[in-house]
Amino acid sequence: MTKDIIAYANNETLVDTQSFNNDTNLTPIYFDNSKESLEVIRHSCAHLMAQAIKSLYPEAKFFVGPVIEDGFYYDFRVDSKISEEDLSKIEKKMKELAEAKLDITKYELSKAEVKEKFANDDLKQEVLLRIPDGKVSIYKQGEFEDLCRGPHVPNTKYLRFFKLTRVAGAYLGGDEKREMLTRIYGTAFADKESLNEYLKIIEEAKKRDHRKLGNEMKLFAFDDEIGGGLPIWLSNGAKLRSKLEHLLYKAHRLRGYEPVRGPELLKADAWKISGHYANYKENMYFTQIDEQEYGIKPMNCVGHIKIYQSDVRSYRDLPLKFFEYGVVHRHEKSGVLHGLFRVREFTQDDAHIFCMPSQIKEQVLEILSFVDTLMKAFGFDYEMEISTRPAKAIGDDEIWDIATNALKQALDEQGLKYGIDEGGGAFYGPKIDIKITDALKRKWQCGTIQVDFNLPSRFKLEYTDADNEKKQPVMLHRAILGSFERFIGILIEHCAGELPFFIAPTQVAIVPISQNHHEYAKEIAKKLLELGIDSEVYSKNESLNKKIRTAEKAHVPMILVLGDEEVANKSVALRDRRAKEQKTLTLDEFITLTKEKLSEVRF
């Protein structure tokens, strides 16, 4: 079957085998695990799942079932509640349908005909509202059929290696004011080995889930009385963040960035000038003060623009680099909130560079060097993608072309590889997205570098050039981590909670065997704190083994056990959990070791 053609590609458009008419411009897609093939297989598997659900729950009505990264889902309505325990039953029915080797066929009707055909299906009517006028394609397999643009595999025999992964709720059309539908997620591959490998990764991901580990490590919490998407940083989490912020602050200053702070609340007039009001309002929070509209900032750029405008600028001042740990708020629908990965309040390691056009390439390359240093420090591989003009954007095509080409030239001249995300740019300019790969080979979008000619024009920014003429600067928007929340969540999962020593909330656990050893433990803790190292003395009246297990569960990098011998000799029994070794050191030797651990990292 690996040599079977399941679809065709026409540039970036996929076409099913039924639509093939000997067009030599079409490229065959074979039954394998290529990106294009998996899209067709997973799309078809979503329909197979829907067919199985319809067979088991005849009253079921279906909304949409798209392919997503690593799988697919289907939103539908049933009378009874479907739980995780029901997935095996649905999978069994899917296997029966796959083994039946049903042909998958396509036919087309006018939109009016489809509307009449599904007159008694309100969810189909909802789908029709989202489809442009013209012919509507319907795919049919056995007794099941559904609206779909396709393409699909030609027969259900190709759908043998799948797994339904979870059940969730989803608002109709993502609208919190509409009804809640049932959503089942799944995945599929062309062979059993690839499926099993993926399922192993899923199981490992569950163990590494930052929400689970964050609770075990007492890093952060969420509270319904406070609200969804609003993380509460506990003491350990605050220490972790503080260490990360301190290291980044120093790294920015060494690279010539000036610390600034903009207000969190700005008049709506400022957001109207910037274009956020027209292009980003649905993602913002607004309020009234003294009968005037204000918006809570979703980005830090307007505040930095006003700081630029607070003084007369000369070409000699450029590039001018401002940075801040800016707290921003963005409206996210409750259904997409997910731990620290998707929140409504977060802090960006945000910077804006105001420079002359001739300095763009140099500044972009400097930022890329900064990115590389940071990613290597945390053990991340990464790749880059240039995101171009979206449908909803400000500025003319010429300005966008200049900005996009500036990014491409900077990457090309360094021989750096990158992909293109057509239409993925911010509304005010193209950007380079930094996508990191974690220990489970998952890709995460974190940092961005954006070239912006539009906001300097809208706010009439100026500098005086060498000929004493007024010129408009270019503005580079830049975040390397993206947000502290998201980056910390990714880092926790990447390290399975075993955070690098230099940012671990508690770096050393000090475990006195008995009450007689507490004073020595406190003495060590004080010495470590003077070095900027956080430790905790485990002084509860518990067994030695329980104290050590507690420290291990908290993922503390180093554990010191203190008994009579250690007190007498001014030594420590060290368990280095990262190096996976145990040894006895003098206290001075241990202090030297911790200093070396801290000095290993240079941003």
Swiss-Prot record:
It is an enzyme of class 6 (ligase). The keyword Nucleotide-binding applies. Residues 209-500 are annotated as: Catalytic. It comes from the Bacteria. Zn(2+) binds at C301, H352, H477. One of its GO terms (cellular component) is cytosol. InterPro entries: aa-tRNA-synt_IIb (IPR002314), aa-tRNA-synth_II (IPR006195), aa-tRNA-synth_II/BPL/LPL (IPR045864), Anticodon-bd (IPR004154), Anticodon-bd_dom_sf (IPR036621), Thr-tRNA-ligase_IIa (IPR002320), Thr/Ala-tRNA-synth_IIc_edit (IPR018163), ThrRS_anticodon (IPR047246). It catalyses: tRNA(Thr) + L-threonine + ATP = L-threonyl-tRNA(Thr) + AMP + diphosphate + H(+). Its EC number is 6.1.1.3. Catalyzes the attachment of threonine to tRNA(Thr) in a two-step reaction: L-threonine is first activated by ATP to form Thr-AMP and then transferred to the acceptor end of tRNA(Thr). Also edits incorrectly charged L-seryl-tRNA(Thr). This is Threonine--tRNA ligase. It comes from Campylobacter lari (strain RM2100 / D67 / ATCC BAA-1060). The gene is thrS.
